[in-house]
A protein has these predicted regions:
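Flexible loop/turn segments at secondary-structure boundaries
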Residues: 93-97, 126-130, 169-175, 231-235, ...
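Short helix/strand-capping turn motifs
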Residues: 85, 361, 369, 375-376, ...
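Active-site-proximal structural scaffolding
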Residues: 80, 102, 112, 143, ...
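C-terminal beta-strand-rich structural cap/linker in extracellular carbohydrate-active enzymes
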Residues: 460-499, 520-522, 531-547
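Carbohydrate-binding surface patches
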Residues: 338-341, 346, 385-445, 475-482, ...
Length: 547
């Protein structure tokens, strides 16, 4: 059985797990209003397997306009920039940024030979007083030219898009009474608990976010990363219609970014009000922050990212956060996890420190990401467990191209007693491929197991067992054998099956559209002979292979 807290027009439920293992359900207005006699309490669904149960629960939630304003991930557009590799200022600079640093790094990125297509300017640019926003223009000391100089570095075939970080409520603690907003915008604000907030009615809140988005769009930005969303509700708490007003903030941001054709990356937006009101946006953070060189935090980050995707992945692509390609602790693991997530992938190292070997396997020559058909989620045995303490391997998978399933096995254990764990891949794992999404059932097929690291292939007739020593991962592709052929894809890319499109396949002939350069791997069976053929691809093209 699956149960999830929900919001009403001006009510919010939540679950608390007690010390004795019992669970308490709460519901409140979180303010001065009385709770109505009837309010939504829980989203509940029972089913035969966890994937279909959660999917059906969210389908029911999408139909309930009192509790949510949602569309499924597959029904929404995905912002074009997020299909490409990006770079973010945060983990390298934190909030110590200025105009010259950003411009110098954009120049270094362009000279690096790595096709990074968007730059995201994170916290550190805002005009504020006591962590309250004073205006939607950057700090004049740090950015004396405003955004004009930085925008001049946009190029159609280089850094094409630039995004900007803001908080849903303006800044961390809301809006400052000492602000430079136009009078018409000030009239849409009211004081509460030491801050100015948009409100109190829906029209005023919408007018504030119309100004918010249009001001940043006029300055040249293509998308916004809107952070601190979950803390907007606490800023409203204790007043009248606290939940309704906080919900209107999310609704208005969604409506205005959509209307003004601005991309939206939701960040720290995991409370019910945030998650259940993504009517247009299609990317949300699913974990704590990534921190370079921090092994324990990296393990928790991976665990959270995949587990939370079981829920959030119903309505958005998961954002696994930025990463450092030069991270000697987990740079390669992070790169592969971003690949299988299907969400935005953006670096955060100093551009001079980029490690190309961890970056190029993610993308084609234009910086376009190779993405799965659906986000990676935990395999059944890895769902109701804590892989940091389980003493077992943690397995996640996603459907990738040409009928393949891409699977990563991790050792995320923190105890020294479990530095070595055993992982098993079984043939029946492949039958779960279409359980992750509502796809047509997978027929009984022969399956090829391809080890990405060793570049070895074998038919998976029963199971394959291997060891995971220390904080590590192993990447595999489970590919169907059809008419004596298996298309694995371009070896140099993490998501090899997503690098090739099958045009036609007969007993003796295979026609493919190969999407990037590299070494194409194809398994071929002819009479009693089996061959893993390597074909050099010097340019993306259509090719014909004969047995």
């Amino acid at each position: 059985m699956f149960a999830k807290a929900v919001a009403g027009r001006n009510s919010l439920s939540w679950l608390q797990v007690n010390d004795n293992g019992s669970v308490t359900l709460y519901v409140s207005t979180l303010g001065k209003d009385y709770l109505k006699p009837e309010v939504p309490l829980l989203l509940i669904r029972q089913g035969k397997d966890i994937y279909s149960t959660i999917r059906q629960a969210y389908q029911a939630l999408m139909k309930n306009t009192e509790a949510a304003d949602l569309k499924s991930r597959t029904a929404k557009e995905y912002f074009e920039a997020f299909r490409y590799l990006g770079w973010c200022t945060w983990e390298h600079y934190h909030d110590d940024i200025n105009e010259s640093k950003v411009i110098n790094d954009m120049k270094t990125i362009e000279a690096s030979g790595i096709p990074i297509r968007y730059v995201l300017i994170d916290d550190g640019h805002l005009a504020h007083k006591n962590r309250q926003l004073t205006d939607f223009i950057p700090d004049k000391q740090r950015f004396p030219s405003g955004w004009k100089k930085i925008m001049s570095y946009k190029k159609e075939n280089k850094i094409k898009w630039i995004g900007l970080w803001y908080s849903l409520s303006g800044y961390w603690m809301g809006l400052s009474p000492e602000n430079g907003f136009p009078q018409v915008v000030r009239q849409a604000l009211y004081p509460h608990a030491g801050s100015l907030l948009p409100g109190t009615d829906s029209t005023r809140i919408r007018s504030f976010y119309r100004y918010y988005v249009s001001t940043l769009k006029e300055q040249g930005f293509d998308f916004l990363k809107v952070d601190n969303q979950a803390f907007t509700l606490p800023l409203y708490m204790g007043g009248h219609e606290s939940i309704r007003q906080a919900t209107d903030c999310n609704r208005s941001l969604e409506a205005e970014t959509h209307r003004q054709n601005m991309g939206l990356m939701n960040c720290m937006a995991q409370n019910v009000i945030n998650t259940d009101h993504t009517s247009y946006s299609n990317s949300t953070r699913v974990s704590i922050d990534y921190k370079k060189y921090d092994e324990d935090m990296a393990k928790s980050h991976l665990f959270q990212s995949y587990t939370n995707t079981l829920l959030l992945g119903q309505t958005v692509w998961p954002d696994h956060d930025m990463f450092h390609s030069c991270d000697t602790v987990c740079g390669t693991l992070m790169a592969r996890s971003k690949a299988i997530s299907g969400g935005p992938v953006y670096l955060s190292d100093a551009p001079r420190d980029f490690i190309k070997e961890n970056i190029f396997p993610l993308i084609d020559e234009q910086g376009k990401l190779f993405r799965p058909e659906a986000p990676a989620v935990p395999m059944p045995e890895s769902i109701l467990t804590n892989p940091l303490w389980s003493g077992k391997a943690y397995r996640v998978a996603a459907p990738s191209g040409n009928g393949a399933m891409t699977l990563i096995c991790y050792n995320l254990n923190v105890s020294p007693r479990h530095q070595q764990v055993q992982a098993i891949i079984k043939k029946e794992d492949y039958s779960l491929r279409n359980s992750f999404e509502k796809m047509s059932a997978t027929s009984e097929e022969r399956v090829l197991l391809y080890n990405w690291e060793s570049q070895k292939a074998e038919e998976l007739s029963d199971s394959s067992t291997f060891e995971l020593i220390g904080f590590t991962d192993k990447l595999f592709h489970l590919c169907p054998i059809r008419k004596g052929w298996t298309v694995i894809g371009v070896q140099e890319k993490y998501l090899s099956p997503s690098t090739v499109q099958t045009i036609s396949l007969t007993e003796n002939r295979l026609v493919l559209n190969v999407l990037c350069t590299g070494t194409l791997k194809v398994w071929i069976e002819n009479s009693s002979k089996q061959e893993l053929r390597s074909i050099s691809i010097d340019t993306p093209k259509k090719i014909v292979i004969e047995k």
